[in-house]
Curated annotation (Swiss-Prot):
SMART domains with a match to the protein in the record: AAA
Region Disordered, annotated ranges: 1-20
Role this protein plays: Part of the ABC transporter complex PstSACB involved in phosphate import. Responsible for energy coupling to the transport system.
Pfam families to which the protein is assigned, alphabetical: ABC_tran (PF00005)
Its EC number(s): 7.3.2.1
GO biological process: phosphate ion transmembrane transport
Source species of the chain: Listeria innocua serovar 6a (strain ATCC BAA-680 / CLIP 11262)
Keyword hit for Amino-acid biosynthesis: no
Major subcellular location class: membrane
Residues annotated for ATP binding in this entry: G57, P58, S59, G60, C61, G62, K63, S64
InterPro entries, alphabetized: AAA+_ATPase, ABC_transporter-like_ATP-bd, ABC_transporter-like_CS, P-loop_NTPase, PstB-like
Similarity comment text for this entry: Belongs to the ABC transporter superfamily. Phosphate importer (TC 3.A.1.7) family.
GO cellular component, one term: plasma membrane
Protein name: Phosphate import ATP-binding protein PstB 2
Amino acid sequence: MLTKKPEINTILQTTPDPHSLPAAMATEDLHVYYGDNHAIKGVDLTFPENKVTALIGPSGCGKSTYLRALNRMNDEIDGCRMEGQILYDGININRKEVDLYNVRKEIGMVFQKPNPFTKSIYENVAFGLKRHGMKNKKEIMERVEKSLRRAALWDEVKDDLGKSALSLSGGQQQRLCIARAVAMQPKVLLLDEPASALDPISTSKIEDLINELKNKYTIIIVTHNMQQAARVSDYTSFFYLGEVVEFSGTSELFTNPQEKQTEDYISGNFG
């Protein structure tokens, strides 16, 4: 755990209130239960468009559970139920009649551990496109190239698209998973500790990529690494025991937290 606050490289300035900006997503009074375990307790958060929001907090605080709730991934877990609203484009997607396939197309997700398909590099990106009905080979190839370029991977793999994705390094596999997600042209990307299993060089590439991707997508990232949150995010939400303790601009939260629990956590006094 850090013993000092993460350094903020920019001059402290007031970040616009997230509620004053156009919202890509929001939750209102969101609760998540695993059986009798009340994992998320009435969370209200708003995620501004084309910004990066980091979710931080100690292990077991609920941040990954909350992230998975945003595109209904928790529906795959037996005994899990959710109450409250998950608003995407102003529509509550926490309803039984919602098409989850389309939800996850619009709200893409990249997991902590790279999980490429046991297919070629090309097929990893093209698979979802074909499944959604794209048939023109030229159009598919154009989308594959565009997605790999956006994931800063094209120059490294353009001559090896037929090779197995499993032959790539861990960092390359994670960028391939990001390319696979952006190929579906989502509006929101959910990143669950995308660099935690990577070496420092690969981590740096992922962070640079996040800063590029926010020009096209709204990004919500879970991270245990507070230095990383400080480097890549515009807004930060501190979770503790399934609740949001504080949510503000990243520079404000790390340099002038308003809650003692936040101050204690970023100073390394607990968590």
